Each structure stands twice: as structure tokens, then as C-alpha cells.
Amino acid sequence: MLQAHTGYDLAIIGSGAGAFAAAIAARNKGRSVVMVERGTTGGTCVNVGCVPSKALLAAAEARHGAQAASRFPGIQATEPALDFPALISGKDTLVGQLRAEKYTDLAAEYGWQIVHGTATFADGPMLEVALNDGGTATVEAAHYLIATGSAPTAPHIDGLDQVDYLTSTTAMELQQLPEHLLILGGGYVGLEQAQLFARLGSRVTLAVRSRLASREEPEISAGIENIFREEGITVHTRTQLRAVRRDGEGILATLTGPDGDQQVRASHLLIATGRRSVTNGLGLERVGVKTGERGEVVVDEYLRTDNPRIWAAGDVTCHPDFVYVAAAHGTLVADNALDGAERTLDYTALPKVTFTSPAIASVGLTEAQLTEAGIAHQTRTLSLENVPRALVNRDTRGLVKLIAERGTGKLLAAHVLAEGAGDVITAATYAITAGLTVDQLARTWHPYLTMAEALKLAAQTFTSDVAKLSCCAG
């Protein structure tokens, strides 16, 4: 039986952060919305991405904290017992709660329907939907939003199709702790998963083509590599996975690095080399929507495709694949599609965080990017040995690097390796957005014994030797 859904102002494919932000904004405008979702409502972040991974990272950090407690005089380190299935069950419960509170319940509260099925564009444009419970449906709307996100992708590796490898998605579904986990990829997924499983008790080997966190400053890459090695993670830089095959209940991998080939046996292999936009099967060619090399939907600055009635938001576009970008995109599309607002977004001061411990965070361009762009600049790097909060924590691993425009002193970028780096970088984001100079940043109030004080101290290094200043001296 054919179901017909017609007369909507906005039809959305997908149900993640971008989709929900658009739907909420549209409903707040009094517009009608219908959403089509082929899988679990909520998208990547709440189901298999941000929420479950950070929940497990927090648990791993708590366990590691007990193991590392001997850095404080008078405290003896312990090794807490681990019930991995119980940990995963708790994670699943949390995910279910947040999925209900922040997604499915909101759809009911705001009043839009979620059609569960796989959507394909047809002439009109309109959507043809193969319903999950059988049958078909059609959806017609004034405007359409593609918010289908992205999915893990794997490079061509000899034998990879013959082994049961993990991705960032399936790693969150493991019911038993891996004995030895080999991870390919040194981006945020590879780094977070490496430390997560190592701190829970797995033996971890990490292989990367260049350096860890290769999109960050070299000082941060070197710092996190040293920390990983100290925690017992085996790190192979400038290394490629050439071949892999089954080996009993595990895998045998051939790695090629600076010293030639070596073989590594592991119980599990995690591929964390990147993601690809989910656009296959959408029938975009039928409605004049172009895609790029990695399948991303090509959009203009207003997030409109070549078809004036079809828009795209989030990971499915060429823009940075952060959940907060997707959410901002969704609201923007609602404004532009339904109100003709022609709003755009400024990504200049877009912060990013990798939730290792200590964490990595940055905002603005790297020093190499500024040099390539011909922007005259000056830099200062502050070791956490000069930060009171790090000293009382008895953990001075990390740094803060600030980059300022030469001549004006305007803050251009901040790069942080520290506990709480995500919170520190938020303050730096505000400073860059406000156009502050490093001198103004140095003279801005910063509470003593907070990690954010590192920003003030780093700003002071442009004119002072902070090692020779008393506490809080400005």
C-alpha cells in the first residue's frame, strides 16, 4: 500500500543533529516538517559517536586516575577491577536515555512525524521511501534537506576485505575487551580509541602514515606521542598497513615503516582513517544535485544545492564534520529555505577538540598554514610547567601555543595540549572572535589556579618571561 505525505514546508532526510536543529527551527516558525530516517533516530553522535565514546573515555580516565594516583605523595596507586560488559551496558543505557530526551521525545513535543524508511529522490522533486516495515511512501515538500551525515571509510589494503575489522562505529559495540588492538589512523578517532582501550587494559599498537594528530602543531603531535608511549601504547609513525590476513582468531598485519617491513599479530584491527559522506542511493543525479570526490553534496555558502529547493547540512557537505557545525547548519537552512534569509556562517574561529587525556584543542590556523597564506605572524609556546593549575595537579604534561599577527598583536590562533583543553580553547575562541590582541588577552581577568589562566600566561610571554613573575602578576 502506498502512503502519501504531501504539503509539507520542509522534508528532511536523516535524524541527527543537523536534521533536528532544522526541524526545531522550522517548527518554531510555525512550518510543517516531516523527517525520513532509515536507521536509529539520533544520527551518529548520540548513538555511535560522541556520546558513547566520551562516556567510555571518562570511565577509562577514572580507572587510569586510580592507577596514576601515586604522583601525589601519600597516595598509593591501585588498579580497579573492570567488568567490561557492565561498562558497555551502562554506556548503552546512557545512550538510550539521551536518544529519547534529545531526539525522539522532542519530535513528539514539537510535532513532526518521523517516517522510518530509505528515501530516494525522484522527479519533482519528491521522495520515494521504502518503508522499513514494508510498503512504500511518497513525500512532497516545498523544500528538502539532506542531512544524512557520514560513515567510516577504509583505504584499499591487501586482504582487508577478508578480515572482520572494526570501525569507530563497531568499536562502540564490542562486548569483550580486545586483548591486543591494532589501530590504523592517527586522527581524533584513532587517538581517542587508542587511549580508551589502553587504559581499560588492552594492549594497543597505533600505526599512522605521518605523525600523530597530523593536522595539529608539531609540538602537540610530539607531546601526545610521548604521553602515549609513557602509557604503554606502541606507536609507529611514518608507517603504512600494507597487508592483513586472518591468523587464528586474530589478524596478522604487515606494516611498512622507516625500518622496512614488520609483522604485527593482534586480536582486533580498528580502521580509523576517515569518513565519507552518505549519499549513495539518494538519487541525487535525478534532481540535479552534484556531489564531490568523497560523495559530499556540493552546496553554496547558503547551504543550497544546484537545485534551489534542495539543501544540505552537516557531515554530508564539505564543511568540518563536527556535530556543532551540523546543528548550526540545520538552523541556517531553516532560515534560508523558509525565510529567504541568505545567512552564512563564519568558520574562522571554529574550535576543535580531541578528547585524549590530556586533551588536544585548537582554534584558528596552524603556523604552517599562516606561513603558506603569507600572513606575517609571531608565536609563543608556554610549557605547562609554568601553569600553577598544572603544578598543583602534579601533571605538567602539555603546552599552550599562541599565534599573533605581527605588527598588530591580534590573536590569530591558539593550540593547546592540556587537561581541560576544550574549556581553555573556548575562551581563546571568544578572544579571537572579539578581535583581541595578545596584550588585551594578557590584561583580561583570568581566575588563579584554573587551566584557563594558561591563556593569560601564554599571552604574557609575548612581552615577559613568566618564569620570573610572581603568582598572578600582570
From Swiss-Prot:
GO molecular function: flavin adenine dinucleotide binding; mercury (II) reductase (NADP+) activity; mercury ion binding; NAD(P)H dehydrogenase (quinone) activity; NADP binding; oxidoreductase activity, acting on a sulfur group of donors, NAD(P) as acceptor
Listed Gene3D superfamilies: 3.30.390.30, FAD/NAD(P)-binding domain
InterPro entries given in the database record: FAD/NAD-bd_sf, FAD/NAD-binding_dom, FAD/NAD-linked_Rdtase_dimer_sf, Mercury_reductase_MerA, Pyr_nuc-diS_OxRdtase, Pyr_nucl-diS_OxRdtase_dimer, Pyr_OxRdtase_I_AS
Disulfide bonds: 45-50
Top-level EC class as recorded in UniProt: oxidoreductase
UniProt xrefs under SUPFAM superfamilies: FAD/NAD(P)-binding domain (SSF51905), FAD/NAD-linked reductases, dimerisation (C-terminal) domain (SSF55424)
Catalytic function, reaction form: Hg + NADP(+) + H(+) = Hg(2+) + NADPH
Inducing or repressing factors: By mercuric ions. Negatively regulated by MerR.
Keywords, alphabetical: Disulfide bond, FAD, Flavoprotein, Mercuric resistance, Mercury, Metal-binding, NADP, Oxidoreductase, Redox-active center
Cofactor: how bound: Binds 1 FAD per subunit.
Record's function text: Resistance to Hg(2+) in bacteria appears to be governed by a specialized system which includes mercuric reductase. MerA protein is responsible for volatilizing mercury as Hg(0).
Further comment found in the protein's record: The active site is a redox-active disulfide bond.
Similarity remark: Belongs to the class-I pyridine nucleotide-disulfide oxidoreductase family.
Summary of subunit composition and partner proteins: Homodimer.
Name of the protein in question: Mercuric reductase
